Structures are given as C-alpha cells and as structure tokens.
Amino acid sequence: MIEAGELGDIRVVHAAYVQDWLTLPIDADGHKQAEWRTDPDRAGASACLADIGVHAHSLALFVTGLELDAVSADLATFVPGRRLDDNAHVLMRFQGGARGVLAASQVAVGNLNNLSLKVYGARGGLEWAGEEPETLRFTPYGEPSRILRRGGPGNTPLAIEGSRMPGGHPEGYVEGFANLYRGAAELISARRAGRPPERTAKLTPNVLDGARGVAFIEAAVKSSQKDGAWTSARFD
C-alpha cells in the first residue's frame, strides 16, 4: 500500500517493541536467557535495543522503504545492578525528511511481546500491532478508518501470496518464519538455476538488512553515550 502511494509521502513513523519480562532482576538470579542478554561480554554494548529494538527498526525500514539519516537516543537501565539497558527511546531522522520515534522496553509492565508500527503520510495512515496480527488499520485522510483483515477484502496480491490459511483462521508468527525460509530457499534455487526469483522471495531479508540493524544499534549507543547528541546512522 505504501509502495503503491496510498499513504502519499511518508512523514511520521512510530515503531515500538515493549515487554515486561526483565522488570525484576532475574538476570542476577540465574535466569539463563536474561543473564547472557544483559552481560556486556556476551551481548555487546546493548541489551534491550539490540535484543528487541532492532526488530522494530527493521520492521519500520521494511514497511516504509525509508533509510535512516541520524538518531538521537536515550538508553536507560532501571533495574539496580543491571549492566546494560532495559529501556530505549530513539528519535529518528530519515533520508528524505520523514521523522520517527522508536521505543523499546523490557520493563514495561503489562506487555508480554508488544511489537507495533504506525506510519503516517500526506494522504493517509497505517497502524498495526503484533499482538493482533490479523488486522491492519488504514485511514485515508478525511475518510473513516478501515480495518483490513488478513485473507479478506482489500488484501494486496503480495499479502495474499504470503498467507497460508483462509481468512478468519488465525495465522502469523510461525508462518512468518516459514515464509522467510521459503524465500531463502527460492533465492538459492533461482541463483543455481540462473533464473529470476519469485517476487515474494525478493522481500527476504539479506546480509545488508542485518548490517543496517548493526549500524542502527551502534549509532544509538554512541548517541546515548553523548547525552542524546544527533549521530549519523546512514548505511552507505
């Protein structure tokens, strides 16, 4: 829909990924999953932002097609004794002029695994939440909001190709991984056969997408260390 211009030029992007599983100091109590994620020797320079915030970043770039220009970040650690961040707020400037904000937290009580994205353009807006993945809220400017359901009227051809179950039959997380594996296999098969890959396979993340995520994390960490100073996040 964005690629087709239904939102017009993108102006504002809100991305968030919030959880509450690190609200208590379980990393200091032998919880293996929490322990390594908050250990700078094993996890690197960031915990929360590198663990889940980067997924919100990747989602925002994938959906909008935008590229980052610079970030202003505030990484915080709320649980005493924890060595890496458990909360992150990042202001984003995109190449082309759009603005964005990304929030990531693992101490947001009441949130199990809440990934969400809101995109607003000159002609309309889109809103999606990972805990309700079957629906997409689309609002053309000056018109009533429309709730689009996976497998229902209004789905784009690519969305239909990415679905496996009929509309109304819950689908999502596991099937998303299956689509990634299928896309990767198709890219390999097409390369070996010397033919163009299927169009859905072209959406499969590659090493450059991973490198973009690393560049984003590094820029945000540097910005936070400089009290939120605007820091280049360009991936050239």
PLM regions and their residue ranges:
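Predominantly a Rossmann-like dinucleotide-binding segment in NAD(P)-dependent oxidoreductases
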Residues: M1-R82, L136, D227
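NAD(P)-dependent dehydrogenase/reductase Rossmann-like domain
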Residues: E127, R195-R199, P205-L208, R212-G213, ...
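Conserved loop-to-helix N-cap of the C-terminal "lid" that shapes the substrate pocket in Rossmann-like
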Residues: A50-G53, V174, T204-A211
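A general structural signal for well-ordered alpha-helical segments in protein cores
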Residues: A56-H57, L180-A185, I217
